[in-house]
């Protein structure tokens, strides 16, 4: 245990077998494959003489709670999860830096809040990327209107069920339209908390895994240089994110 210790945090959900099949389902695709990013980062830390630790705070999905009381937890979750993430960070006092992995519109803002709330530590974010489009199906933006279209008798129940099942063309990643999830990934990159081109990589792709490896290497370099979140989050980086968002 003589190596420098680094903490990996994520929003992982579900239980994924090594072949990708589900032992237990997650709430959504956005947290289904992020464990692979954690594994890649952990192996990279180990290969360079560091000791990886890992912690988790999973996240829900509005796609499951629309029209139910569960939607009352949607916005509140971000603050609650950010608090728990920060408690996990403080609960490993020997950590030299934090690598956060998150994807969607609740887990990723929560992770950003937690990293921003750790100004004296080197931190980096690895976005969980996006799911791919399916052939002959509606995207994850359009399917959110299925309930309204069904209520207006514009589609049949059978069509709504089929489109809902086909919306995600791959098992991992966030919604592939520029909603809050994808926008949060872009804003995180604009803030300088991810590597360049870190946002919106296709989940499961080689470039997606390589991002985790390079992010772990970057965090090692940040720690070596004494560069912390306080140095990355500045008036200029926030201006850059605002311009990008606008």
Q: Residue locations for each model-derived region?
A:
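Metallocofactor- and cofactor-centric catalytic cores in central/energy metabolism, strongly enriched
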Residues: 1-246
């Amino acid at each position: 245990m003589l190596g420098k210790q680094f903490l990996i945090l994520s929003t992982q959900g579900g239980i994924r077998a090594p072949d990708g099949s589900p032992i237990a389902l997650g709430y959504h695709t956005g947290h289904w494959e992020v464990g692979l990013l954690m594994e890649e980062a952990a192996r990279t830390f180990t290969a360079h003489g560091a000791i990886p630790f890992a912690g988790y705070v999973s996240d829900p999905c509005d796609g499951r709670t629309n029209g139910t009381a569960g939607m009352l937890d949607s916005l509140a979750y971000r603050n609650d999860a950010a608090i728990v993430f920060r408690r996990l960070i403080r609960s490993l006092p020997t950590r030299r830096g934090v690598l956060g992995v998150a994807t969607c519109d609740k887990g990723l803002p929560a992770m950003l809040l937690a990293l921003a709330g750790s100004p004296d530590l080197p931190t980096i974010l690895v976005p969980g990327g996006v799911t791919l489009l399916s052939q002959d199906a509606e995207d994850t933006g359009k399917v959110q209107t299925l309930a309204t279209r069904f209520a207006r008798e514009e589609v049949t129940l059978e069509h709504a069920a089929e489109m809902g099942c086909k919306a995600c063309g791959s098992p991992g990643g966030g919604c592939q339209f520029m909603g809050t999830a994808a926008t949060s990934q872009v804003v995180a990159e604009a803030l300088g908390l991810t590597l360049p081109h870190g946002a919106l990589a296709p989940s499961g792709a080689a470039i997606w895994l390589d991002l985790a490896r390079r992010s772990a290497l970057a965090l090692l370099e940040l720690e070596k240089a004494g560069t912390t979140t306080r140095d990355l989050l500045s008036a200029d980086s926030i201006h850059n994110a605002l311009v990008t968002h606008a």
